[in-house]
Amino acid sequence: MNFCLKYIPTPIGRLCAVADEEGLLMLDFEDSKYVEKDLNSFKNCIHESNSILDLVEKELNLYFKGKLKKFSVPVKFSGTEFQQRVWEELLKIPFGETISYQEQAQRLGSPKAVRAVASANSRNKISIIIPCHRVIGKDKKLTGYAGGLDKKEFLLNLENTFYKD
């Protein structure tokens, strides 16, 4: 199976996107601490777009303009069963809202698994679309974002700016 790779410019840096014909497998900032390792896990990666990557770019452009609150891009998770449950829960956090890691653990039915939840969030390979940036510390402080706290703050401010009830 071939994987397509495309770099997508955004207001906060280029995103590295990898997809096959069925869904998005990776979307991460090119300067993220995990991007190189994650890219190496895809063999036969070709530098060209496909319909999934074209949709990713289109929807990201709309998102950064405040014209898209929910992505329709099909995603393909790659992780443990627990990680996948954590990432599915992230998809339930609405645009413009945040929850704490503790609240996310409670929603998963594992209230004592706060560190495990935070660790799974840090291994989310599909930034922005799977919105781990919407999870903050219980004291409302910004913590833990593989792309960098400056990017997390930008994304939360962007969503807050365009958030309407």
Q: What is each PLM-predicted segment?
A:
Residues 1-112, 162-165:
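Basic nucleic-acid-binding alpha-helical/helix-turn surface characteristic of O6-alkylguanine DNA
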Residues 138-165:
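…primarily DNA-binding HTH/wHTH and HhH modules…
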